[in-house]
């Protein structure tokens, strides 16, 4: 009987330590929405995050990409209809520390690099456009819903062109392993 209890205790301890170590990593995929000052519609896209948290302190790396494709006008050139479009893209990469407040909640702050590009196209050719890059800063929280499931939300700020600000909001669902 004592051997059975001892074996059960050792197996339980091994299983528990594997679970604790297994939850050091979180990979999240989520929805991103960028609000750029002076643009009537929001850019929408994808946010990817990877978090490594071996203890109270950890590290987060994130990638964000959003786009907006607008058809503006149609013109007739040489008896063919050409659609004029305006394409906008925003992308960023950021990295920063995480801090675990308790078993369920951790927060993060990031610094990174963001680009914003806009192109006006007439048919298949680009008629005008611009691209601007700048530093970006962000912050957010991550909630561990279960041992293997996490929910995160955050905001990212960057400035582009002549005092035009970009705010990107993200919400994601992650798998802890």
What is each PLM-predicted segment?
Residues 1-26:
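Cleavable N-terminal export/targeting peptides
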Residues 19-75:
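Short glycine/proline- and aromatic-enriched beta-strand/turn motifs that initiate or cap beta-hairpins
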Residues 23, 42-46, 87-91, 131-137, ...:
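Residues that define the transmembrane beta-barrel architecture of outer-membrane proteins
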Residues 27-33, 61-67, 97, 109-113, ...:
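Transmembrane beta-barrel strands of outer-membrane/channel proteins
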């Amino acid at each position: 009987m004592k051997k059975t209890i001892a074996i059960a205790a050792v197996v339980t301890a091994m299983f528990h330590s594997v679970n604790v170590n297994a939850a050091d990593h979180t990979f999240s995929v989520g929805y991103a929405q960028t609000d750029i000052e002076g643009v009537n519609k929001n850019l929408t896209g994808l946010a990817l995050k990877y978090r490594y948290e071996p203890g109270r302190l950890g590290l987060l790396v994130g990638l964000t990409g959003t786009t907006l494709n607008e058809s503006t006008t149609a013109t007739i050139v040489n008896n063919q209809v050409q659609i004029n479009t305006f394409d906008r893209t925003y992308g960023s990469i950021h990295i920063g520390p995480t801090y675990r407040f308790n078993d369920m909640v951790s927060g993060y702050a990031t610094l990174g690099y963001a680009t914003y590009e806009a192109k006006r196209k007439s048919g298949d050719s680009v008629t005008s456009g611009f691209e601007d890059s700048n530093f970006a800063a962000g912050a957010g929280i991550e909630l561990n819903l279960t041992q293997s499931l996490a929910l995160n939300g955050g905001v990212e700020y960057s400035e582009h062109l002549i005092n035009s600000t970009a705010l990107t909001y993200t919400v994601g669902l992650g798998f802890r392993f």
